[in-house]
Each structure stands twice: as structure tokens, then as C-alpha cells.
């Protein structure tokens, strides 16, 4: 009888890709295992649609993709941001129950587990109805996971964690070697309007799961991983990363060819790449400051610049229709020999290109892992979610990044941010980022971590062995 795992990712590209690539890894490592991935559509994220199409166009043996029925975007648009994903899964519970019921009744298949994104952990109730064990996938790092458990524990002890918002307190968090400034705490955990009670309820449910699988590796976050393992109230931890989509999403291949062709013409390690994630957009005044900082730095650049969602629209836009309307007058002409401004970018391919020597990033966890895998140092520009914390970890804990602004917050459901990072700061930090290896300790550390990341995924590496232990638990 074959064994089957059911995966339920959250419908945002950073969550979905990690779980699907993990499913492919599971299948490649265990010949008697099949995986069914249940995908819910999310109205804002065009990347989900593109990636989904690529999966259906290039199927993987023993990997089944099931698209759950689409729901009306109007069901979510007026909800507070913390309530959107819970609403998504609530609308899909009946469909998920029917799928699990049908699979558990099969005489040829044994359902060995449900692996749910942390945001969808409440689906555990349905898995329990069918005696299917639930495992949790954490798309963020071990440091963040430890912080969330710590804040949830404080909340359970009746400490008002919202008091940390806008304070100069430093917290002693078990998953961090250094005190964590309150200013880098994810706002969703300390904002009275941010749904922190609901989020902490998810981490309480996580403690009921069979195990937690994290997209990280021992050598990157040894302190955080060890702290989680030392806590008897946290389920077994399995770091199995870095799990990355190294082949891209299969879309925009013509645009990718143009971008990579331009990089082919640049000297090695000469280009700084700017990309701020699926929801990383700026107001016009900030765009102009970035442009001036880039121009003054004198470095070659590739800049992924994407517009905010237009009023009345529900989907992110891939690029501006007219760049001259938002950039400084004459910028494109003056920098035409050294720079290229684009919309969508094939991020992993760009980071892996020998011409790229630095990455100005929003510090999403997937982007962090990609920069490590490719050995490209980062200048941190965190914007939303847990990215401020990721930036702090990269700069202070790991020493693999240059700090620009770790307190910049531009929450993707509230783009009205008055804080401006000035051109002078951007110029200075880009110059520091692009220093050669002889003069840059950060660049040396990133190159070392690149080798460690690849060893972790190789036979008998730390993540390879961690996955083997997880199979023993599941099978």
C-alpha cells in the first residue's frame, strides 16, 4: 500500500513555493510516498497563479495538485488584514474535509499525515476527525518561530505584549543570542488591531502538532534551533532547508532572457540587485530617493520596481506602464549604460548570476535563503511581516548583511508610511555592500555560508539527515 501526505500551504507565493518544493523533495527521497497539495486561490497574489500554471504544465510524478474552488475576492477585501487568511481557510473547510474523507477511505492508499502551513494549523480539527496526524510547516526561520512562541507564552501569563509597540525595550528571547529590540518585533504580534490574539492561538495549536518542519538549516541558525529543541513544550523540530525553487516559476521566460542577457554583459560581482518581494512597493518620494542613492553610488544596478495596487483593483501589478512618471527627470538616460529598471524579476536566476555582487532586499525569509544559497551579501530594507526581525538576525546574529533601516515599516495592507530613507543613506550602504571580499568580512561570511547551505542538503548533511529522521516519524 502506498503512503500519501496531504499538504495545505497558505495561498501566498512565499508560503506556497516552499511547500511545493518540499513535496518534490519528499517524493525524491522516498519512493513509496505520494503527495497531494491542496491550493487555495488568493486574489492579491498573481505569483500564485503563475506558479500554479507552471506546476500543471510540468507535472511531477507522484505529486498531485488540487485547486480548491475559487471564492469571491469581495469576501476578504473589507476584512482587517489579520482576518484574511483565516477567512480563506474557513471558506475551504468543507472541501478539505471531503478530500481527506475520500483519501482515507481508499483501499490502495494510507494517509500518513497532513502537513499544514502554520497559518492554517486550525485545519488540524478536520485531520483529527479522520485520525490523521498533523505536522506544521513554518515558512519563516527558527529565530522568528522561537520569538512567536516566547510572545505567546508571555501573553498566556497575562503580560500585555502590546506594550512593546513603539517602546525602547530590549527582550531576552530564547531563540536569539543578542537582546532583541522591541522596535524589530513584527507589528502583527504587538498591535492591538493586528489580530495578535488570533496569531497566538495558532502557536498554541502548533504545540499540539506531531512536529514542526522549518525551512532553515542547522549551520545558519544553530542557536535558535537548539533553543527550540530544549523547550519541552514545543514539538520535535526538523530543519530541512534551504528548500528553494531554483528553476523559477516558468513564467515570463522572454523577459527573463532579456534580464539575464543584460547581466551577461556586466563584469563579475559588479551589479547591485534591488528587489523587495511580492508586496514591496513604494510611494513616489521614496522611489526618487532610491534612484538618487543608486546614481550617486556609481555602481551598476538591476532594480525590480513594482507599483502599488491601483485603487479599486485586487491584484498586484508586475510593472509600471511609464517609468519616467515616477523616476527623477533624466534618471533613465543618465544611468542607461550602468543600470536597468525592470518590473518582475527571476530572482533566483539573478542572484545566481556571476555579475551580481550585492542584494538590496526586503528580507523575506525565502529571499534570505536564496541570497545565502547564491553567496550574495544583503543590504537590509525590511518592510512588513517578520522582515524587521529577519534583518536584525542577519545583521546582528549572523553577520551576513549590511543594515540600512531595520525599523522601516510599510505594511502591505497599509501603504501610507511617512518614513523616508534618504539618498545619502542608500548611497553609503550600497558602497559598503559592494566592497570586495578582501575588504568585506560580510562577503567572506556569506561565501562560507553558501558552502554550508549546499553541504546541509547533500547526502549526510544536517538537513538531509533531519529529513531522514522525519520520515522515520511519519512512515
Swiss-Prot record:
Transmembrane segments: none annotated. Pfam families: UDPGT. It is an enzyme of class 2 (transferase). UDP-alpha-D-glucose binds at residues 345, 347, 362, 365-367, 370, 386-387. It comes from the Eukaryota. Disulfide bonds: none annotated. The active site is at residues 15, 117. It catalyses: (20S)-protopanaxadiol + UDP-alpha-D-glucose = (20S)-ginsenoside C-K + UDP + H(+); (20S)-ginsenoside Rg3 + UDP-alpha-D-glucose = (20S)-ginsenoside Rd + UDP + H(+); (20S)-protopanaxatriol + UDP-alpha-D-glucose = (20S)-ginsenoside F1 + UDP + H(+); (20S)-ginsenoside F1 + UDP-alpha-D-glucose = (20S)-ginsenoside Rg1 + UDP + H(+). The keyword Glycosyltransferase applies. Its EC number is 2.4.1.363, 2.4.1.366. Pathway: Secondary metabolite biosynthesis; terpenoid biosynthesis. Keywords: Glycosyltransferase, Isoprene biosynthesis, Transferase. Component of the dammarane-type triterpene saponins (e.g. ginsenosides or panaxosides) biosynthetic pathway. Glycosyltransferase that catalyzes the biosynthesis of ginsenoside F1 from protopanaxatriol (PPT) and the conversion of ginsenoside F1 to ginsenoside Rg1. Triggers C20-OH glycosylation of ginsenoside Rg3 to produce ginsenoside Rd. Mediates the conversion of protopanaxadiol (PPD) to the ginsenoside compound K. PANTHER family: GLYCOSYLTRANSFERASE. Belongs to the UDP-glycosyltransferase family. This is UDP-glycosyltransferase 101. The lineage of its organism: Eukaryota, Viridiplantae, Streptophyta, Embryophyta, Tracheophyta.
Amino acid at each position: 500500500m502506498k503512503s500519501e501526505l496531504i499538504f495545505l500551504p497558505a495561498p501566498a507565493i512565499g508560503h506556497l513555493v516552499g511547500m511545493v518544493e518540499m513535496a518534490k523533495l519528499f517524493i525524491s527521497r522516498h519512493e513509496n510516498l505520494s503527495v497531494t497539495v491542496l491550493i487555495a486561490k488568493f486574489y492579491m497574489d498573481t505569483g500564485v497563479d503563475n506558479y500554479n500554471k507552471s506546476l500543471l504544465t510540468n507535472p511531477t510524478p507522484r505529486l498531485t495538485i488540487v485547486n480548491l474552488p475559487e471564492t469571491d475576492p469581495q469576501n476578504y477585501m473589507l476584512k482587517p488584514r489579520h482576518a484574511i487568511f483565516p477567512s480563506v481557510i474557513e471558506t475551504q473547510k468543507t472541501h478539505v474535509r471531503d478530500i481527506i474523507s475520500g483519501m482515507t477511505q481508499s483501499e490502495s492508499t494510507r494517509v500518513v499525515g497532513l502537513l499544514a502551513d502554520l497559518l492554517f494549523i486550525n485545519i488540524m480539527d478536520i485531520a483529527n476527525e479522520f485520525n490523521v496526524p498533523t505536522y506544521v510547516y513554518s515558512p519563516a526561520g527558527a529565530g522568528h518561530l522561537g520569538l512567536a512562541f516566547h510572545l505567546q507564552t508571555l501573553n498566556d501569563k497575562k503580560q500585555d505584549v502590546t506594550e512593546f509597540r513603539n517602546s525602547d525595550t530590549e527582550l531576552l528571547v530564547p531563540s536569539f543570542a543578542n537582546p532583541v529590540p522591541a522596535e524589530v518585533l513584527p507589528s502583527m504580534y504587538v498591535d492591538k488591531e493586528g489580530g495578535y490574539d488570533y496569531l497566538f492561538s495558532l502557536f498554541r495549536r502548533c504545540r499540539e502538532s506531531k512536529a514542526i518542519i522549518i525551512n532553515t538549516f542547522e549551520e545558519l541558525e544553530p542557536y535558535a534551533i537548539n533553543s527550540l529543541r530544549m523547550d519541552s513544550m514545543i514539538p520535535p523540530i526538523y530543519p530541512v532547508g534551504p528548500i528553494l525553487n531554483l528553476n523559477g516559476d516558468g513564467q515570463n521566460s522572454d523577459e527573463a532572457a532579456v534580464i539575464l542577457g543584460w547581466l551577461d554583459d556586466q563584469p563579475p560581482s559588479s551589479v547591485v540587485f534591488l528587489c523587495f518581494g511580492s508586496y514591496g512597493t513604494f510611494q513616489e518620494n521614496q522611489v526618487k530617493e532610491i534612484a538618487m542613492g543608486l546614481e550617486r553610488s556609481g555602481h551598476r544596478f538591476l532594480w525590480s520596481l513594482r507599483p502599488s495596487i491601483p485603487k479599486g483593483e485586487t491584484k498586484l501589478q508586475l510593472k509600471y506602464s511609464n517609468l519616467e512618471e515616477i523616476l527623477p527627470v533624466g534618471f533613465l538616460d543618465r544611468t542607461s549604460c550602468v543600470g536597468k529598471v525592470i518590473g518582475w524579476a527571476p530572482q533566483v536566476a539573478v542572484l545566481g548570476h556571476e555579475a551580481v555582487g550585492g542584494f538590496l532586499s526586503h528580507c523575506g525569509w525565502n529571499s534570505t535563503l536564496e541570497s545565502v544559497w547564491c553567496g550574495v551579501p544583503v543590504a537590509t530594507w525590511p518592510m512588513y511581516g517578520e522582515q524587521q526581525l529577519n534583518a536584525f538576525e542577519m545583521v546582528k546574529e549572523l553577520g551576513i548583511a549590511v543594515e540600512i533601516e531595520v525599523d522601516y515599516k510599510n505594511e502591505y495592507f497599509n501603504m501610507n508610511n511617512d518614513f523616508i530613507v534618504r539618498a545619502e543613506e542608500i548611497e553609503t550602504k550600497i558602497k559598503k555592500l559592494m566592497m570586495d571580499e578582501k575588504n568585506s568580512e560580510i562577503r567572506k561570511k556569506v561565501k562560507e555560508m553558501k558552502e554550508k547551505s549546499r553541504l546541509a542538503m547533500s547526502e549526510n548533511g544536517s538537513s538531509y539527515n533531519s529529513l531522514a529522521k522525519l520520515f522515520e516519524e511519519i512512515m
